[in-house]
Amino acid sequence: MTDRYAVFGNPISHSKSPFIHGQFAAPTQESLTYEAILAPVDGFEASLTAFFNAGGKGANVTVPFKEQAFALCDSISPEAKLAGAVNTLSLLADGTIRGDNTDGLGLVADLIANLGSLQDKRVLLIGAGGAARGCILPLLNAGIAQLIISNRTHTKAQLLVDIFTSVDNGAFANRVTAVEMNELAGEFDIIINSTSASLVGELPPLPTHIITTQTVCYDMMYGASVTAFNQWALSQGAAKVIDGLGMLVGQAAKSFTLWRGIEPDTQVVLTLLRDKLMAEPK
């Protein structure tokens, strides 16, 4: 019997997930399908229920349904709990739904693939939305020394800090802080842009001195050409820039492993996906 998986979103036609999971499944000889499902903005729960009732085993969730998916779960992972959102749903044998958030795990996996260990790194995280929130715990668990969160609206960055400094009796209290963009100081090993500004060719209002010839800049956005943020980072002398395509493949791999118990080869699929992206009409 063929196991069914899907990604839910609105819009969803642009999703790379069916291609990625198809490539993950191909070498395993396992029988499964993965489709993109356009759920009505006001009909996600009904669409998901219908999918599971029809034999669906698991699902990915993207914009704008991650928070709704979180509310539907019977159990959630620590990453999902702190993110307040899920991107991966698993229908368990007892009929309950487990929610995971693999976005931050995908980010960390891609950073490690590119840079090696993140131990003792000083990291700047730009943005304080859902994308930022989902990657904080995985970054901290990867052993970074300090995480600075900076956002146009400072109160949102401070809210994230308050959430994470209360975790595990304050275990992260000395490692996470919020700083106004115009007050950023010192050098950073890694700067991560979690905002979607690059999609419209815009940049966060950052001081140029935060980038040195040792700084690696990571934009969660991606495209056929270098993103606006990464272009700016290179112009300021960054040592290396990375876009979010590897994070996309990485989070998908974590989902695939949760469902199938198999760790797929992400680098092969990332190369195929990059080639596919470059070949798409501009």
Swiss-Prot record:
Pathway: Metabolic intermediate biosynthesis; chorismate biosynthesis; chorismate from D-erythrose 4-phosphate and phosphoenolpyruvate: step 4/7. The keyword Transcription does not apply. NADP(+) binds at G127, A128, G129, G130, A131, N151, R152, T153, H154, T155, K156, M220, G244. The keyword NADP applies. It catalyses: shikimate + NADP(+) = 3-dehydroshikimate + NADPH + H(+). Transmembrane segments: none annotated. Keywords: Amino-acid biosynthesis, Aromatic amino acid biosynthesis, NADP, Oxidoreductase. InterPro entries: Aminoacid_DH-like_N_sf (IPR046346), NAD(P)-bd_dom_sf (IPR036291), SDH_C (IPR041121), Shikimate_DH (IPR011342), Shikimate_DH-bd_N (IPR013708), Shikimate_DH_fam (IPR022893), Shikm_DH/Glu-tRNA_Rdtase (IPR006151). GO terms for molecular function: NADP binding; shikimate 3-dehydrogenase (NADP+) activity. Its EC number is 1.1.1.25. One of its GO terms (cellular component) is cytosol. Shikimate binds at S15, K16, S17, T62, N87, D103, Y222. GO terms for biological process: amino acid biosynthetic process; aromatic amino acid family biosynthetic process; chorismate biosynthetic process; shikimate metabolic process. The active site is at K66 (proton acceptor). Belongs to the shikimate dehydrogenase family. HAMAP family: Shikimate_DH_AroE. Homodimer. Involved in the biosynthesis of the chorismate, which leads to the biosynthesis of aromatic amino acids. Catalyzes the reversible NADPH linked reduction of 3-dehydroshikimate (DHSA) to yield shikimate (SA). This is Shikimate dehydrogenase (NADP(+)). The gene is aroE.
